[in-house]
């Protein structure tokens, strides 16, 4: 278990998963996707999976962290929604059949360790994608890593949890940012317990991402500036890619 698993929901309270699901649903309809079997890849604690299930999708959700999935299963118990959760690394995805739509949200692909692993993950999605099916994902851009995360430090004060997020831009070909988290959780006696963790995120230019999609056997349908239907810009901090598996 990584410490992010324990604090994930509290540190992402600013995210409206309902809005995220509605945005992805809009893209699915716009690009001719079927409202049928949907895979939520790297689903985390299942908040987005829950929203897709409420919208009528038949949802399968995977994550490499059993701790995250335990939180997701707690939500499933409360909601009663028929979501199937599987503990799988996205580079080793293994489905029982083909999937109509795969969603990978909240820059999950950026958390992979290398370009090779990113290609493996995209290849796996393509392998299990129904012909005519879609793969929609968002990623942080090299621009964001170089100019926004860069060498900056961010602080999150959430009453019972205090988080210091420190970035170090490595300047490597994969625009790697090394991230250090220091999380302080308030105990019942008012004192704080400190937890620490280090991890990295990688990012690639739009053209490189498009090459990886094409190498998997899928086509690039569109690339949008994050959370819009606007085209990608050179200063986009996040991009949304829509890929499709050809019918033949």
Residue ranges and their predicted role:
Residues 200-248:
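C-terminal lobe and adjacent flexible extensions of AdoMet/dcAdoMet transferase-like proteins
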Residues 136-210:
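SAM-dependent methyltransferase
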Residues 119-131:
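A short glycine-rich, Lys/Arg-flanked "PGG" loop and its adjoining helix->strand segment in the class I
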Residues 94-101:
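A short acidic, Gly/Pro-enriched loop at the edge of an enzyme's catalytic core
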Residues 1-5:
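Conserved small/polar residues in nucleotide/adenosyl-binding loops
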Residues 39, 47-92:
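Class I SAM-dependent methyltransferase SAM/SAH-binding core
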């Amino acid at each position: 278990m990584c410490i992010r698993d324990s604090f994930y929901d509290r540190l992402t309270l600013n995210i409206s998963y309902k809005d995220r699901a509605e945005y992805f649903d809009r893209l699915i309809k716009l690009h001719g996707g079927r409202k049928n079997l949907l895979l939520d890849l790297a689903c985390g604690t299942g908040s987005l999976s829950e929203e897709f299930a409420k919208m009528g999708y038949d949802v399968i959700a995977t994550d490499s962290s059993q701790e995250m999935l335990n939180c997701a299963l707690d939500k499933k118990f409360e909601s009663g929604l028929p979501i199937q959760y599987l503990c799988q690394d996205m580079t080793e995805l293994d489905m029982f059949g083909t999937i109509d739509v795969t969603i990978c949200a909240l820059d999950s692909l950026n958390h992979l360790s290398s370009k090779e692993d990113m290609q493996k993950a995209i290849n796996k999605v393509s392998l299990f994608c129904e012909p005519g099916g879609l793969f929609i994902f968002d990623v942080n851009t090299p621009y964001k890593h170089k100019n926004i995360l860069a060498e900056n430090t961010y602080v999150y004060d959430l009453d019972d949890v205090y988080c210091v997020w420190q970035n170090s831009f490595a300047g490597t070909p994969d625009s790697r940012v090394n991230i250090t988290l220091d999380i302080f959780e308030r105990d019942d006696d008012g004192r704080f317990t400190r937890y620490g963790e280090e991890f990295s995120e990688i990012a690639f230019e739009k053209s490189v991402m498009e090459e990886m999609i094409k190498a998997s056997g899928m086509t690039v349908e569109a690339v949008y500036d994050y959370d819009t239907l606007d085209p990608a810009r050179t200063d986009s901090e996040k991009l949304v890619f829509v890929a499709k598996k050809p019918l033949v």
